[in-house]
Amino acid sequence: MADILRFWKAKGIKGFRFDVINVISKPEVYEDDFEGDGRRFYTDGRNVHKYLKELVAAGGIDGMITVGEMSSTTLENCIGYTAEGNHELTMCFNFHHLKVDYKDGQKWELREPDYLAMKKLFQTWQEGMQAHGGWNALFWCNHDQPRAVSRFGSDTTYWKESAEMLAAAIHFMRGTPYIYQGEELGMTNPHFTRIEQYRDVESRNYYKILRQQDKTEAETLDIIAQRSRDDSRTPMQWDASENAGFTTGTPWIGIADNYKAINAAAQMDAPDSIRSFYKTLVALRKKMPVISAGKIEFLYPDNADLLAYRRYDGETELLVLCNLREREIAKPLPVGWTDAEKLLGNYPDTADTLRPYECVVLKK
């Protein structure tokens, strides 16, 4: 692995992502496991920290950007992986917040997202990393996850509002935000209706398993449509031409039917587009140290409808309010925030409530 790192470093590569890197330390003695899938034996093994230090030193990548994808990890281990003086990784991906809609922890069982659980996870990881010098990689989407706007928002009625709210929710947090291809356009799940449209081997296998569990064809396809890794693996939607401008040939998988409306060309010069909103988020993070380096405090932990937190650094304070629901909710303001300046929002005007999927960022 060190040879691979040196090879790409010599070509000018500035950073590396390590896939499920916390499973590289395996036990020397194999034990029987009568619970679960055995992951407790191979996840965050006792030599992972040692191996990472050796890899960073041998690969000559200390000081470069490195992000580790962590499987079933813990906060304590990720603090150790990312603490600056440990010379292991710059930041970690963890997936706990993306399991809040798993019924009984099972990916292929549907349920509504548990937003209180999600908020608690955000708070635990944000405050834990802050207290002990660790660093989070912030994300909703990747190549294995459904599209966030279809999963935690509305990809129809409130498509734009929910896509922008989800973006703001993590881009103002402490850590490094990641934007998955097409997320900045609000790309949705493709909503395939036939199993033949899928290429993902996991989805095809679970189609058979679910049918064997006596689920109907319609029930099975609904589950697959909401959970498949193919939801995020359809071609990038560049424009409204055939195949969304991705290729003049035949793509390996189909394209979402909404590509003529949701594509890069349609948003390139549109000042009120989702892409424009993302550009504003990136610009604010570059401009305002409180976003990239300030502290974070979470508010209203028992409110299942509202994600709210404060960022502060001694000079500037921000209040981030995100309505997680497809309905109007109350807009609570802490003492001293009534006359604060509106820095950003995904509605053109202001209101005394938070409208469906509304986000508001206040500054003082």
Ranges and model annotations:
Residues 1-336, 341-364:
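Active-site and adjacent substrate-binding regions of carbohydrate-active enzymes
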